[in-house]
Amino acid sequence: MSQKQMKEAFVSNQNGTSVLEITEGLCLPALCILCRGLLIILSQQLCSSLHNSRTRFLVDFAFLIVPLVTTLTIFSSFVLLEYLVAIILGAGLLYEIYCRRTCYARMPFQKICEKFLKVSLESEHIPAISCFRVVNSAFTAVAILAVDFPLFPRRYAKTELYGTGAMDYGVGGFIFGSAMVSPEVRRKYTKGSRFCYLTKSLYSLWPLVFLGVGRLVAIKSVDYQEHLTEYGVHWNFFFTLIAVKLITSLLLLICPLNRSWVVAISIAALYQLALDFTPLKSLILYGTDGSGTRVGLLNANREGIISVLGYVAVHMAGVQTGLYVLKKRSHIKDWIKVACCILLTAIGLFISLYIVQVNVEVASRRMANLAFCIWIVASCLILLSSLLLGDIILSFAKFVIKEAAVPCSWKLIQSPTANKKHLESIVFDAKRKEPTLCLITAMNRNQLLFFLLSNVTTGLVNLSIDTLHSSTPWALCLLNLYMFTNCLIIYVLHLQDKTIKFW
């Protein structure tokens, strides 16, 4: 067996893990980001050592990237222990900040909370959405290289037919995150005719076409290992993004934007009916001749082409979520309601997932069936609600510390009925320049470039190193170095105020 065949076999025929285990791992970054914000606030009270570019990068890397690497590798069986450490650290930092509060020092906790609920937020940008997209990007970047090493648990790898693996979440999470900030949600193409809107949508696809074709040519030219049942012979992630964007652009021309959830449910349900009552499922699994043929364009790429329908449903659900979250709100209490509503919706979807998996069909990444779509949306909503709740706690910490500033977090604007002296301090915080020393902002700014860098460096590592026989310490060092390099490049570009766009 050749090295290529060994690597392909190493990532194939996996059955995944439980939905609960994946959900546990997904919510941990929200806690880590909260701890990072609390540490920055406390450091502003104690010293200024965290306010230079090098130190801030290391802090962000330690709180955002390192926990992801360890959760997907050596601490995969100790996620609850990581939660315990993060909760203790976060609670300790919050308690210390509260004890050192410079505002409302003599006021009881209940009164402080009452005043906090009256605070307004400068909500032009929602930090939780930026963090959501960055967490998904970082998770994907770690996983695509880690999966080739023995220290990566096989249960986290992409499943072969049925089941839920941590890596199965990646594409769906990316599509959902992109949908939340799509031009339609941001009303970017509101001016002009429908034809103008469609033209702009099509024009925005050419970088993805370039990347998709480029990846296909590169993979075939170097004879790189491939997981055939993931997308097919020629298809890849970029082609899925193109197809989803094309279909959803047409759908949003026909259907009202605020009824995207109806479209999402309809597509997912009809697609599942087609899988159950037509030869569509047999076509995906066994090809047109029933023997797994890869002859012809459809047979060669049947998984990638047909699963697009499921991802379209996920995208439409993301559009509806984006419309809800990006709706203008002024008070912190409104955002508490939003976070709770999203959390309850996620719980409802997880209950629906259980019912569907028991009575209809188990989740399948390969087909992107109804259960898979529900799982992706529920997982995205649980992560988003965790990040929103973390932002609210961080806002409380900023509320009690005069002139506290944390990059990629809400700016506070006090309500007119509040204490005048504290009003001045919070308005100053709202008007001061946002610190640029932030890895999260940097990754969100050049997300596509970060993903491209991760793919290229993953290929270089695989071509130059025998990943299958790498020891755990060596693999862990390589993974952290790989992520450190990619993050540093993106961070330096951000410090130089450069956004790399191909369109």
Swiss-Prot record:
Modified residues annotated as Phosphoserine in this record: S415
Topology, Lumenal side: 1-21, 76-78, 153-160, 223-236, 281-304, 359-369, 469-472
Top-level EC class as recorded in UniProt: transferase
Topological region Cytoplasmic: 43-56, 99-131, 182-201, 258-259, 326-337, 391-447, 494-503
InterPro entries for the chain: PIGW/GWT1 (IPR009447)
GO biological process, one term: GPI anchor biosynthetic process
Membrane-spanning intervals of the chain: 22-42, 57-75, 79-98, 132-152, 161-181, 202-222, 237-257, 260-280, 305-325, 338-358, 370-390, 448-468, 473-493
Keyword field contains Acyltransferase: yes
Annotated compartments: Endoplasmic reticulum membrane
Keywords: Acyltransferase, Endoplasmic reticulum, Glycoprotein, GPI-anchor biosynthesis, Membrane, Phosphoprotein, Transferase, Transmembrane, Transmembrane helix
Pathway terms, separated by semicolons: Glycolipid biosynthesis; glycosylphosphatidylinositol-anchor biosynthesis
One GO molecular-function entry: glucosaminyl-phosphatidylinositol O-acyltransferase activity
A Pfam match: GWT1
Described purpose of this protein according to its UniProt entry: Acyltransferase that catalyzes the acyl transfer from an acyl-CoA at the 2-OH position of the inositol ring of glucosaminyl phosphatidylinositol (GlcN-PI) to generate glucosaminyl acyl phosphatidylinositol (GlcN-(acyl)PI) and participates in the fourth step of GPI-anchor biosynthesis. Required for the transport of GPI-anchored proteins to the plasma membrane. Acetylation during GPI-anchor biosynthesis is not essential for the subsequent mannosylation and is usually removed soon after the attachment of GPIs to proteins.
Family the UniProt entry places it in: Belongs to the PIGW family.
UniProt name for this protein: Glucosaminyl-phosphatidylinositol-acyltransferase PIGW
Originating species: Bos taurus
Source species taxonomy: Eukaryota, Metazoa, Chordata, Craniata, Vertebrata
